[in-house]
């Protein structure tokens, strides 16, 4: 990000969406991929994707804490999945309450969130996953990425006013 407090993505962050997003307590999500300069993701004969070393998958989570106030939109966390030489690394950054900065979590954490939706107020524990928890879902069996896959990307996305099939746009 060029400005953490403003949530301004850097120019090399390519946004993408998924066809079947996972539910995370009503959190809004923004997804990005960063590829090393001159590198591409390739499709293998079995339909899976091969990511070059240095690829970074980014997912940011935010939540509207009070549906009466747009100003209550709060960034909660950003997760990074980084392609290394032999495997993937997982990193969760938890934003401070004001969203101006984020801290790398060494372990998982929980935070009680108070959310008002449709005149109903509820408090629930929001969970920030540890590296081990990330690796549980993002295993070799799931190709490490649950979202950046052919079946999830084969749909349209709005690229700053240009609506295009993601597989075409990302090619």
Put a short name on every predicted segment.
Residues 37-45:
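N-terminal post-signal-peptidase region of extra-cytosolic proteins
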Residues 45-47, 137:
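Short, conserved secondary-structure segments in the cores of folded domains
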Residues 67-171:
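Sequence context surrounding c-type heme c attachment/ligation sites in exported
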Residues 51-54:
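Short, well-ordered loop/turn sites that connect or cap secondary structure elements
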Residues 1-35:
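N-terminal pre-domain segments of enzymes
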